[in-house]
Amino acid sequence: MRVLILGSGVIGTTTAWYLAQSGCEVTVVDRQPASGLETSYANAGQLSFGYTSPWAAPGVPGKAVKWLFEQHAPLSIRPTRDLRQLAWLSQMLRNCTAERYAVNKARMVRLSDYSRDCLNALRASTGLEFEGRQLGTTQLFRTQQQLDAAAQDIEVLAQYGVPYELLSPAQIAQYEPGLAGGGAQMAGALHLPEDQTGDCRLFTQRLADLATQAGVQFRYGQQIERLEHAGGEITGVQIDGRLVTADRYVLALGSYSADLLLSLGLHLPVYPLKGYSLTIPIVDAQRAPTSTVLDESYKIALTRFDERIRVGGMAEVAGFDLSLNPRRRATLEMVVNDLFPGAGDLAQAEFWTGLRPATPDGTPVVGATPYANLFLNTGHGTLGWTMACGSGRYLADLMQGRTPEIDTEGLDVFRYLSTRSTRPHREAA
C-alpha cells in the first residue's frame, strides 16, 4: 500500500514510522528543508502523559475576562477578521462545562496513556536519544484554590491508573531542589512520576533518519497546494504544480490542515493557538530544574535538557501571526527568575513562537474521514509530542485493517460532522 503523508512535524514523522513498520510504502512531503522545523521546533519539551488536560475547562470563561487586564496572562485573544476564529471560540466555550471537561479529559488521558507505552517501546527497540529524561512533572500550585481545583483532575488520573503524588510545600524540593533558590511561595504540588522530557525537534529529526533507513521517502521544500477528489475518494495531491498520487493519504499539517480540507466540503475546527518559548543555556546546574516544572498560575513549563532550559507556554488566539511579542518574552523571563534565579543566561536565550493546532474540545482528530482513502492526524494542541506515538500507531493499525489497541471513541472527525455524514466502507489492506 502506497501512503502519502502531508507534513513532517512530530505527528507526520511518527505516523510515517509506524506505517513503514507495518509494511507500507511511505512518502512524506513538507515545505520545510527538514523535519520538525515548525511547531515541533522548540515546544516546551514535555511528554505530559499524566498532565493531559483541555484548555476548555470550567471557570475558563471567567478567567479569560480577568486575564484581559493582566500583564502576564496565560491566555489572550486577539480578534481577527477570520470568522473561523469566532466559530472556534464559540465551540470552545460550549466545552467549558464540568460534564464536557470530564469527557474530553478522559479521551485525552486515554490516548496519552497509550502513547506513553508506544514511546517506551519505540525507545527500547531503536535506542533513540533526544536528551530525554524520565523524572516526571511537578505541577506547582501557588494558591490553595488551585490545589483544591486539581481534585477533579486527580479523579481522572486515578480512574485510568496514572500514578501521582500530592506534595506539601516542604516536599517539593525533594524533586526539584533548584526551587529552594527562588522566593516563590507554594501551596503544594502534584508530582506525576511517569511524565518524561526531551527535545522534540531532536526526536523528530532522529526518528526521520530511522524512518529513512526503513524505506520512507522524505521530500522537503515542496509546496502542498490542494487535494483532488472524485467519487468519494482522493485522486491525488497537487504539489508544486504536479499531481502526486497514492493509495491512501494522511493529512498531518497541524494548524494548516483545515484550509486544505475546505475544497472537500469538510470544516475541521482546528485553529492555531500561538505559543512561545525561550531556550536558555545553563550556567548553574544546581539552580536549574531537574525535569519539568509546570507553573499553574501562568501555564508555563520549565524543562531541563542536558545543557539547556526550555521555558514554554501561554496561548494567543491570534490567527496565523508568527511575530514575536516582547511582552511574552518578559513573562517567560519573569517566571524563570521567580522559580530558578541564576540558573541560565537569559541574554543568550533563543526566543521562538509556534502555532499549535487546537480543537475546541482539546481532543485531537485522528482517524478516518468521509473520503474513503483520506485519514487525519492533527489537532493535538499543546500535547502533540505527548500523543504522537499513540496517534501514529493507532492510525497505522486502522489503515492496515487491524483492531486498534485502545478505545478510539470520539477521536476522529465524525464527532464534529453532521449526523448525515457516514463512515465509508473500507477493505483491509
UniProtKB/Swiss-Prot annotation:
The protein's annotated pathway: Amino-acid degradation; D-alanine degradation; NH(3) and pyruvate from D-alanine: step 1/1
GO molecular function: D-amino-acid dehydrogenase activity
Biological process terms in GO annotation: D-alanine catabolic process
Cofactor: FAD
Keyword Signal among UniProt keywords: no
Pfam families: DAO
EC numbers: 1.4.99.-
GO annotations of cellular component type: cytoplasm; plasma membrane
EC top class named in words: oxidoreductase
InterPro entries: DadA (IPR023080), FAD-dep_OxRdtase (IPR006076), FAD/NAD-bd_sf (IPR036188)
Positions contributing to FAD binding: 3-17
Keywords: FAD, Flavoprotein, Oxidoreductase
Catalysis performed (reactions): a D-alpha-amino acid + A + H2O = a 2-oxocarboxylate + AH2 + NH4(+)
Statement: the UniProt record of this protein carries the keyword Transcription: no
Entry similarity comment: Belongs to the DadA oxidoreductase family.
Function in brief: Oxidative deamination of D-amino acids.
HAMAP family in the cross-refs: DadA
Entry protein name: D-amino acid dehydrogenase
